[in-house]
């Protein structure tokens, strides 16, 4: 398979995953937030950090996922998703949710691929924004 096509497939897969995570959480944002805060109530993470994160997370997933799907500001989207995933991995360790870390690490592998092979991002709106 051509490297540019491979890049597109990975970019779309990660973008749709992140977009979908955010999309399904937004209609039930309050319940999602309450559930996340509750899951951290016995952890070292203070609620003053957990509560705002629980409201910001779905928007970050949705926005960075959408940018990745359309290939606009791909480098920024990849870095934003990396930051989200690192925060999620840290949070998962604090509540000893070892099962979640596996899926998060798979997502990180896709992020690393996209970051490392950014030169193959040809089928994207970035081509029209950055004409160099």
Regions of interest found by a model, annotated:
Residues 1-32, 47-59, 63, 70-132:
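Extended, low-polarity transmembrane helix blocks
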């Amino acid at each position: 398979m051509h490297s540019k096509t491979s890049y597109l497939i990975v970019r779309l897969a990660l973008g749709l995953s992140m977009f979908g995570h955010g999309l399904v959480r937004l209609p039930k944002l309050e319940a999602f937030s309450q559930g996340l805060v509750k899951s951290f109530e016995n952890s070292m993470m203070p609620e003053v950090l957990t509560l705002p994160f629980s409201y910001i997370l779905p928007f970050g997933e949705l926005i960075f996922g959408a940018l990745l799907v359309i290939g606009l500001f791909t480098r920024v989207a990849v870095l934003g998703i990396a930051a989200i995933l690192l925060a999620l991995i840290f949070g998962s360790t604090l509540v000893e949710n070892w099962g979640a870390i596996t899926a998060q690490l798979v997502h990180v592998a896709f992020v690393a691929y996209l970051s490392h092979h950014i030169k193959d991002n040809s089928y994207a709106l970035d081509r029209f924004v950055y004409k160099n």
